[in-house]
From Swiss-Prot:
Disulphide connectivity of cysteines: none
The protein's name in its UniProt record: D-aminoacyl-tRNA deacylase
InterPro entries documented for this protein: Daa-tRNA_deacyls_DTD (IPR003732), DTD-like_sf (IPR023509)
NCBIfam families attached to this UniProt entry: D-aminoacyl-tRNA deacylase
Swiss-Prot/TrEMBL GO biological process terms: D-amino acid catabolic process
Lineage: Bacteria, Bacillati, Bacillota, Bacilli, Lactobacillales
Subcellular location: Cytoplasm
Organism: Streptococcus agalactiae serotype Ia (strain ATCC 27591 / A909 / CDC SS700)
Subunit structure: Homodimer.
Catalytic activity line of the entry: glycyl-tRNA(Ala) + H2O = tRNA(Ala) + glycine + H(+); a D-aminoacyl-tRNA + H2O = a tRNA + a D-alpha-amino acid + H(+)
Transmembrane segments: none
A GO-annotated cellular component: cytoplasm
Length: 147
C-alpha cells in the first residue's frame, strides 16, 4: 500500500458536484493498493496512521495523533500512486492492484480505520473532485513495503 497523508483544516470530496464526504480538522488519505498487499499491510497502515503524532500540541510541537485531537479522516482511493513513468510520456499503472482486489482492500482498510477514528470516503473508481485546506502543510508518504 502507498498512502499519501495530508494534515488538513478541512476537506471534501465531490462526485458530479455532489459532496459525498467532508471533514473538518484531520487527515486526507490518498490510498493506493498493490497486487501483493495483504491484511498485514492494512493493519500496519491503520496502526501508523492512527498513532502518528503529526498534530501540534499547545507548545507548537508535532506531538498529537489524529486520535488525540479527535480528528477525522477523508479517505480517497488513488491507483495513480503506482504510476510507472520510466518509459514514454504516458504513465502505466501495472503496479496497482486489479480493481476487484483494490476495492475489497480499500473497503477493509476504511472499516479498520473506522474502528479508531471517524472516516469519510469518496467512491471507489469514480471521477472525484477533492478540495482541501492543507495545515502546515504536512504531507507524509507511507509505503507499507518500507516498514
Amino acid at each position: 500500500m502507498k498512502i499519501i497523508i495530508q494534515r488538513v483544516n478541512q476537506a471534501s470530496v465531490s462526485i458530479e458536484d455532489d459532496v459525498v464526504g467532508s471533514i473538518e480538522k484531520g487527515l486526507v488519505l490518498l490510498v493506493g493498493i498493490a497486487p501483493e498487499d495483504t491484511t498485514e499491510d492494512i493493519a500496519y497502515a491503520v496502526r501508523k496512521i492512527t498513532s502518528m503524532r503529526i498534530f501540534s500540541d499547545d507548545e507548537g510541537r508535532m506531538n498529537l495523533s489524529i486520535q488525540d485531537i479527535k480528528g477525522s479522516v477523508l479517505s480517497i482511493s488513488q491507483f495513480t500512486l503506482f504510476a510507472d513513468t520510466k518509459k514514454g510520456n504516458r504513465p502505466a499503472f501495472t503496479g496497482a492492484a486489479d480493481p476487484v482486489k483494490a476495492n475489497q482492500f480499500y473497503d477493509i482498510f476504511n472499516q479498520e480505520l473506522a474502528n479508531h477514528v471517524s472516516v469519510e470516503t469518496g467512491q471507489f473508481g469514480a471521477d472525484m473532485q477533492v478540495s482541501l485546506i492543507n495545515d502546515g502543510p504536512v504531507t507524509i508518504v507511507l509505503d507499507t513495503k518500507n516498514k
